[in-house]
Structure formats: structure tokens, C-alpha cells
């Protein structure tokens, strides 16, 4: 977070007692309760889910507004800045572990589960099974008939390649914006930040079109065996992270337009940039392991 440099900045700012954590927890409770009930066929679950989501977002808006006000009023000194940096570092580390688990699941299914199911001792149980990846493709059934409908895989051309170019370009525009901010060129910073936000938005539209194509034209669904589940699990969670990152960059851009951040103090900008570059790296892994291999 940024802060104004003045003589009143405390060594370590201790905020006043806040109701925001408890209110946010209540919103998450409604959201998770509703999601669980909706999945299990309870009609009221969707109302609880959306009510909890709206509640949680409103609390986050108020919470972030308070934090921004404290920052811009000069309450955040070096210790607070350092704590934010370590917090963001550990948050991104947790995200590395999050995606690492999913990449490991993909590797395990391909390298261990399929060969084990295709071994000789299972030949009597599943005589038609073929240890190939993906487990079921059009014209080549590799699982017991009727369990999984045949489907086609999503190759790297052209939608995933277009999205790769979009994300890599957004990383470049974000870096240019960062350098401009470090040199005090606010106008250039804002221009390239808007370019980054737009590139992220276009990425999401392309991925939405990709999903429609995969589901409708390729018959690739969540129920399409382990290939379908890992495909949507990895690309879906990554798309969600792109959406969150895009919102972060949008809020940072709006704050820049309001005059927030200086070339000396702008960790709010840097934290969002770290997150966006992390999203870029994860996509490169997806592009190679999911679409190419």
C-alpha cells in the first residue's frame, strides 16, 4: 500500500477494532452453506449462495476502503509495507502449492494411473481398455463402453495460442506501466494499465468461447473421464485467477487516476503485478502440459 511521507507516520500502525473480519466470515458462511445445499438439490441454496457472495463483496469493499484511507493518510510506515510484502509473498506461495497439486494430479493420472489400469492383471476386468491419453477419444474407445462418451481433445491451435499471446503481451504492458510509475510518469502508467486490463478481459472472452466450443462441438465435458475433469479443473481455476487479477489491476488503475501511489511508495501496484505475473507463469505451464502434451 502507498502512504504519504510525513512526520506523523507511526513506527507500526495498529488499526482500530473492526467488525469487518466477523462480517466477512458470516458472508462466507452463507456462501458455502448455499453452495453445498444447491449442489444437493435444495432450491434455497442458490439464494443463500448469492446473498453470501454479495454480502462478502460489500464487506470487502468497505474493508479495502478503510485500508486505502489509512494508507493515504500516512498511517502506514516501513513495517506495514514490509508486512504487506511478506503477506503477498506467502499468498503467492500458497497459490503455487494450489496449482502444484492440480499439475501433480494430471501427471499422476498420465504416468501412473493409466499404466496401472492397462496392466495385464486388469485385462480380465476391462478387456477393451487401452492405456492411452486421453482415456476416450473419438473413434478409439479406451474405457468400458458406455461409461464415458467419446470426445475430441482441445489442441493448442488456435484459441489457446491466442490466449498465450494475450497474457504474455499483458505482462509486457504491465511491466512498462510499472517502469513508468517508477519514473513518475502517471499518464503513461494509466494508459498501459488500461491496456493490461483490456488484454485480461479479452483473455476471459476467448476462454469463454473456447469452453463453448469444447462443450458443444468437441463433446468435451466435466464427465469426459480424467482428461475432462483435469482440463476444466486446471483451466477453470486459472481463468478464475485471471478474473481476480484483472479486478485487482482495474482497482489499481482507478486508484492511479485518483492520484494514489507515488514513485517511491506503490506496493499496492507491485502486489497486483506480482499476482498477474504469477498467473502468466501458470498459464505457460497449462499451455505446455494440457494443450501440447
Range-by-range predicted roles:
Residues 1-293:
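...captures the hydrophobic TM-helix bundle architecture rather than a specific catalytic motif
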Amino acid at each position: 500500500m502507498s502512504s504519504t511521507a510525513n512526520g506523523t507516520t507511526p513506527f507500526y500502525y495498529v488499526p482500530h477494532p473492526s467488525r469487518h473480519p466477523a462480517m466477512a466470515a458470516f458472508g462466507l458462511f452463507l456462501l458455502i452453506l448455499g453452495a453445498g445445499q444447491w449442489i444437493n438439490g435444495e432450491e434455497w441454496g442458490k439464494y443463500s449462495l448469492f446473498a453470501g457472495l454479495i454480502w462478502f463483496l460489500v464487506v470487502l469493499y468497505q474493508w479495502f476502503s478503510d485500508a486505502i484511507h489509512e494508507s493515504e493518510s500516512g498511517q502506514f510506515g516501513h513495517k506495514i509495507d514490509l508486512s504487506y510484502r511478506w503477506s503477498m509473498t506467502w499468498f503467492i506461495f500458497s497459490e503455487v502449492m494450489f496449482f502444484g497439486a492440480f499439475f501433480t494430479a494430471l501427471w499422476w493420472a498420465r504416468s501412473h494411473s493409466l499404466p496401472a489400469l492397462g496392466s495385464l492383471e486388469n485385462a480380465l476386468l476391462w478387456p477393451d481398455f487401452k492405456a492411452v491419453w486421453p482415456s476416450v477419444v473419438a473413434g478409439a474407445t479406451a474405457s468400458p463402453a458406455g461409461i464415458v462418451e467419446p470426445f475430441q481433445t482441445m489442441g493448442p491451435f488456435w484459441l489457446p495460442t491466442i490466449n498465450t499471446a494475450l497474457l504474455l503481451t499483458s505482462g509486457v504492458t504491465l511491466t512498462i506501466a510499472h517502469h513508468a510509475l517508477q519514473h513518475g510518469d502517471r499518464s503513461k502508467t494509466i494508459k498501459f494499465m488500461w491496456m493490461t486490463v483490456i488484454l485480461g478481459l479479452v483473455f476471459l472472452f476467448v476462454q469463454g468461447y473456447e469452453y463453448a466450443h469444447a462443450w458443444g462441438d468437441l463433446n468435451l465435458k466435466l464427465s469426459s473421464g480424467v482428461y475432462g475433469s483435469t482440463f476444466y479443473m486446471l483451466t477453470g481455476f486459472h481463468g478464475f485467477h485471471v478474473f481476480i487479477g484483472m479486478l485487482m489491476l482495474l482497482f489499481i488503475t482507478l486508484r492511479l487516476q485518483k492520484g494514489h501511489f507515488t514513485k517511491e511508495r506503490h506496493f499496492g501496484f507491485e502486489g497486483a503485478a506480482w499476482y498477474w505475473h504469477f498467473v502468466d507463469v501458470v498459464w505457460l505451464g497449462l499451455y505446455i502440459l494440457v494443450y501440447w502434451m
